[in-house]
Amino acid sequence: MRTAAKATISLRARLIYPTPSNDSVAERGDTIPKIFKGLFIMKKSLLAGASALLACSPAMLMAEEGMWLPSQTGSLAADLKAAGLELDPATLGDLNRPPLTAIASLGGCSAAFLSPQGLVATNHHCVAGSLQYNSSPENDYLTNGFLAKTLGDELPAAPGSRVYVIEDLRNVTAAMLKGADKLDGRARYDRLQANRTALIEACEKQANRRCDVRAYFGGQQYWLQQQLEIKDVRLVYAPAAGVGNFGGEKDNWMWPRHTGDFSFYRAYVAPDGSSAPFAKENVPFKPKAWLPIAKDGVKDGDFIMVAGFPGTTERLRTAEEARFYYEELYPYQQRMLAEYGDRIDELTAGNQAAAIAYAATLQGVENYEKKIAGQMAGADAISLVEKKQAEEAGFRAWIKADPKREAQYGAALAELDRLIAESNAEALADAKRGMLGRGQLYGAARQLYRWANEQAKPDKDREPGYQERDRAFMTQGMQRIERRYVAEIDKALWADGIAEYRTLPADKRSAAFDAFMEGRDLASFYAATELGNTAKRMEWMGKSVADFKASSDPFIQLAVATYDEAMANEAKEKARSGTVQKARSKVMEARLAYAASQGKQMYPDANGSLRFTYGKVTGKAVDGQVWTPFTTAEGIVAKHTGRGEFDAPDKMIELIKAKDYGRYVAPELGTLPVDFLSTVDITNGNSGSSTLNARGEFVGLAFDGTIEGVVSDWMYDPKINRTIHVDSRFMLWTMEKVDGADALLAEMGVKTN
C-alpha cells in the first residue's frame, strides 16, 4: 500500500513532463504536470512562476550545475573545454549544426534522430501512451513489447503525438515588452498576451510551424522558439516491459538500476516533404542531421552532455515559497496521489482491459507521488529551506546596503512578498477545488463548452489553447479519452474527488457547482450522458453556445452552470498575474545585478525550452555505501524472479547466463553494462534526452534520477545529484540479441555480428 509518510518512497517515476503551456507569458511555476490537472487544478496564476526569483545563490554554482541556453555557450567555452569537451563549444549554440540540429521534442519528453530516415530515440516510458493506445488483451504491447519488421508494420502513435524539430530561437524581449512597461494588473497581462499572440501569429504564417514565446529570468528576457511540427508519428520498436520497465515501482528512482528504458518512434511527412497527418502514402522524414552511435561507450570519469527540453525547476523561488511547498503543499499532494494510485489499483484489479486503459494514468500518478516524497526527504537531508533563507538574506542585505538599490528595488520586493503570502494562503484550497477535475467526462464537458465560447470570438482574441492553431490538439485530446476511460471507474474516481472537495468550508467551495449538484447522484450523470461515446463527444466540437445551453446532458449542463463563475475567477487571476509579473520582473533585475556583482553567470529556471547540461560519469558514496557508476547484465539475473516487476524475457536471461554479449562488453567492466550514473543536471521533461560523449556521439539516454537527488528541482547539490542513463551498449545488445531488430541497427549504421 502507498502511504504519505515522508520516509515512504514508493511508486514509479520518470523524468517525463509536459512542456509549459503556451498561454503563459511568465516563467512556468505550476509544479503540477498536465496529467494531474484533474487532480490538482490550481489557480491559473502567473504568480507561481513569477515569484520564483530569489534563491540559488550564484556563489553556490557548481561546475556540473546548470540547464544552459544555447546562447550561453560562448561564455562557457573555457569551462566546457576544461571539463573534457572535444567539439568546438560554438557547435552547442548553433541550431544549424549537430548535435543540436538532431535534437527533437515530443511535447513532454525529449528525443533525438538516430538515422537519416526519421528514426527517433526516446525512453520506453515516453511511448507508454502509444503502447497503451495500440494494446488490447489480444495484442498486449505494453507487456510484450513491439517491433515493426518493416515500415509498413509501424503503428500510429497515440492521437496528438508529435515530433517537434527546433528551427530557430530568437530574442523577442523588446517586442514582448512594447507598450507594457508602464502598465499594471489586467492591462499589463492583456498587453503581454496580445504581443505574444502577434509574435506567434507572424511566426506560424510558415505552414506546419509551432511557435511559442517563453519567459526567462522572471520576464527580463523573452525568446521565441520556432519548431517544425511533424504530425505523423509511428511506433517502431519498444522492448518488453520486462526490459523497458524492469524493476517497476520498486526500483524507480533507485540505484543500482537495471532498466532498459528506451524505444523508437519514426517521424513521417507527406511525399513533398511537408508535414501532414497520418496517411499511408507518407514517407519517413529526412532530418538535417542525426546522431552517430559511438563505437565505444563511456567509462568512469568521462565527460558527457545531455541536450533536451527540461520542463520546470523551482530554483529561483523565494525561501518562503520553499517553506510553504515543503511544509504544507507537498505533503498534501503526496497523500492525495498515494490515495489516487491505490484507488486505481483497486478499481482495475482483475480487469485486464481496464488495467490497460488506466495504465498510463497510473504510471503518471505513481511518477509524481514518488517524486514528491523524494523531494521532501531530500529537502530534509540538505536543509533546503534553511539554505534558501540564508542565501536570500544575503540578497536582501545587498539591496539594503545601498540607498540607491533600496530605492530602485525595495518596493518591488515588498510587493512580491505580499503577493506570495496571498497566494500561499489560498493554495491548499485551490488544490482541493481542483479535485473536481478527477472525472474525465466533466473535464471534457468544460473544455468543449469553453471551446464553443471561444469560437464565437475572432481567432486573435481567443484564449490560448482554444485558437484555430489548437484545433488538432483539442480534437485528438477528445479522441484519446476513448482508450483511457471506463465509465464505472471514472464515476468512482470523480466521486472521490468530489468528496475531498467537500471537505472545504462552504465559503471556499464553488457556489455554482454546489447549487447544481444539490439533490443529484452521480449515477444519473453517467446514465444520461452521451459524452462517453467518442462519436457523440466529437460532435460537440462543432456546436454553438446555444446548443450547449439547450442540452439535456447532465455533464454539459454542469459545465454551462459553472462557466460564468469560472470566468469571473479567471479574470481576477489575470489581473493579479499582471501585477505579479511587473513586481517579479523588477526583482529579477536586482537578482541578475546581484549575481553580476559577484562575477557569476546565472541560468534561467527550466521552462520547456531547449537546454544543454554537462557533467561526468561517476558514482557516489551514500550512507556508508559506495555506488559504482555502472550496473551490469548479471544484476538483471540476480533480480529476476519471473513475475511482477522483475520478469525479464526468458531469452534475455538465457543470453546473460551464457554471457553472450558479443562486442558490447565494456573492457574495464569485463561484461555488458546496463545503466550508468552521471552528474548532469536534468529534470522532468528530460526523459528521452540523448546522452552524448565528448565528440557528440550517442552513448545512451537519460531516463531518471536517484531519489536523494530529486530535490534538485529546487537546489542542485553535487554530493547527492545523480542522473541515471541507459547505456547504448545495452540498447544495441537488446536490439540485436534479444529482439532481432537487425534492420533498425543497420539503419543506424551499427553492424551486427
Where are these regions (language model features)?
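Short alpha-helix boundary/capping segments
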Residues: 1-11
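Terminal presequence/propeptide segments associated with secretion/organelle targeting
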Residues: 30, 43-46, 58-753
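Short, Lys/Arg-enriched N-terminal segments with co-localized hydrophobic residues
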Residues: 22-41
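Bacterial N-terminal signal peptides
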Residues: 49-57
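Short helix-onset patch at the extreme N-terminus, typifying the N->h transition
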Residues: 7, 47-50
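Low-complexity, intrinsically disordered segments with a bias for serine/threonine
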Residues: 14, 25-28, 49
